[in-house]
């Protein structure tokens, strides 16, 4: 009995160490990518931003500062003439929750023309948003907009898909309640990103994606609208 307990204990410790080691590897691997917060460092040769979605409200109903910062960053790039269009990609899990529609609404209220905004309601996860940016919208060198840690994760995914993306980091809220939660969340999200890239390929249904690409007019609309 003692031998069984000891063996179980050692296996549990080994499992925890392997899990922690894999987590650290994933975190550092993703963290090797770089972003910028400086609009002047963004060249004008990139025509599209990929704006990654999140809820516009926190639990309790207060405005989400992460969401507001992403919208403001997208507007800054557009008004500085760095981008011609924005792909607002997020979760539209049901008719009562539609991240892309909210982003489009707030972007237009901030002065971005509605004609410059494309929405992707199937960006359920970061991997989905990035691969759909490439394969559905035909954009292979976007400026990815989100907070720094999220941008790095998206850049890692984009790089694995052969895309030449750059990251424009929206300001990250500094309150301790956000810092602790997001550090923990990002640790696990980066592990999932590495698994997505190397094993599962996200939640994308490849057959459905290829069918959508074949039937989609997004790319041709973009070409007509922005001369790409």
Feature roles, as predicted:
Residues 2-40:
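N-terminal type II signal-anchor transmembrane helix
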Residues 4, 47, 212-215:
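Positively charged, low-complexity intrinsically disordered regions
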Residues 13-14, 77, 192, 197:
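Enrichment for repetitive, rod-forming helical segments
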Residues 93-98, 165-169, 188-196, 211-217:
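A general structural signal for short secondary-structure boundary/capping elements
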Residues 180-203:
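A transmembrane-helix-recognition feature enriched in membrane-embedded lipid enzymes
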Residues 202-228:
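Short linear elements at protein peripheries
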């Amino acid at each position: 009995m003692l031998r069984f307990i000891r063996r179980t204990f050692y296996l549990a410790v080994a499992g925890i160490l392997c899990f922690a080691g894999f987590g650290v590897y994933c975190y550092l691997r993703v963290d090797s990518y770089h972003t910028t917060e400086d609009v002047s460092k963004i060249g004008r040769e990139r025509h599209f931003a990929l704006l990654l979605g999140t809820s516009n409200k926190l639990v309790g109903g207060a405005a989400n500062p992460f969401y507001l910062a992403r919208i403001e960053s997208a507007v800054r790039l557009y008004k500085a003439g760095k981008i011609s269009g924005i792909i607002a990609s997020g979760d539209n899990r049901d008719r009562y929750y539609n991240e892309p529609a909210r982003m489009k609404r707030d972007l237009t209220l901030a002065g971005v023309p509605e004609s410059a905004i494309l929405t992707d309601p199937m960006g359920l996860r970061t991997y989905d948003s990035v691969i759909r940016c490439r394969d559905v919208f035909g954009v292979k060198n976007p400026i990815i907009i989100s907070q720094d840690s999220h941008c790095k994760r998206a850049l890692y995914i984009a790089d694995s898909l052969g895309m030449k993306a750059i990251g424009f980091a929206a300001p990250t809220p500094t309150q301790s309640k956000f810092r602790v939660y997001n550090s923990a969340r990002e640790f696990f999200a980066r592990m999932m990103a590495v698994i997505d890239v190397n094993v599962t390929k996200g939640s994308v249904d490849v057959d459905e994606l290829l069918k959508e690409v074949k039937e989609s007019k997004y790319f041709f609309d973009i070409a007509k609208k922005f001369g790409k």
